[in-house]
Curated annotation (Swiss-Prot):
Residues 1-18 form the signal peptide. Belongs to the IIV-6 357R family. This is Uncharacterized protein 357R. It comes from the Viruses. Keywords: Glycoprotein, Signal. Glycans are attached at N88.
Amino acid sequence: MILILTIIVGFLIYFVTAKRFKLKRLILSICFKTIYNVFKKWWLKFSEEGLKTIVFKRLSKFLKQPYYCNNNVVEYEFHNKKYKLMVNQSLIKKPSYFILNCKEGTGKKEDITLKLQPWIGPEHNFHNTLIKPSDLGYKKLIVVFSIGNKVVVNENDFLPTKLT
């Protein structure tokens, strides 16, 4: 931008000192039209996106995460390639459940909701797949919802896909 302004100022100084008036007027009108179009384009972009967005776009290559992800990035690996899934913060639902593991013999129940979080997914639906407790290495799980309902899931039964 500074380079363009320097070139324009140089042309203006040159043509102000030039002796041919018609050529001077023609070149000055071209310069002013160009300046007007550049500022018009910049102002339209600025008014649509805002200064903060423009600055973040310029600096996004230095940031670890893209500027529009609101720190909701799910990283996963598929066929030996790493992928990132960006989830809009308004789409994430608060969990209204917890999952308990029933240990055999002792009868103690352990909260394993955080351990299963990668399989549960950001929308709390197990990525729309049918998963058994045996797939996760458990024999019996209890899903307790916030309204008080309990679902006992045995080793070969499917976990509920709608947890919220």
